Amino acid sequence: MTGTSIRALAVATLLAGLTAGSVRAEEATINIDNFAFTPAETTVKAGTKVRFVNHDDIPHTIVLANGKVRSKALDTDDSFAFVFDKPGEFVYFCGLHPHMKGEVKVTP
């Protein structure tokens, strides 16, 4: 391999790594513990995956108040993820325990 080929390969490898890193989506986690979502209010950028993780000993669900998302019942240590791809304020609650509420604010 010539010096030019090695340099071209090195540049291509570097650019491939940068591209892969920039494509990676953001992720946020909301924990469910003691019949509460923590944090109860979360602000993320559009395109962020939000993962809800149940740490309680009983099942919980995630339901968006607009009715567009409803998870299955999450047992202990189960999780549910959803990508918030549009800006707005999204109120959610547990369908099994409606007093459990939270909000995800999505910025552009």
Language model features with spans:
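Extracytoplasmic copper-binding redox domains, predominantly the cupredoxin/blue-copper superfamily
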Residues: T2-I6, G17, G21-P108
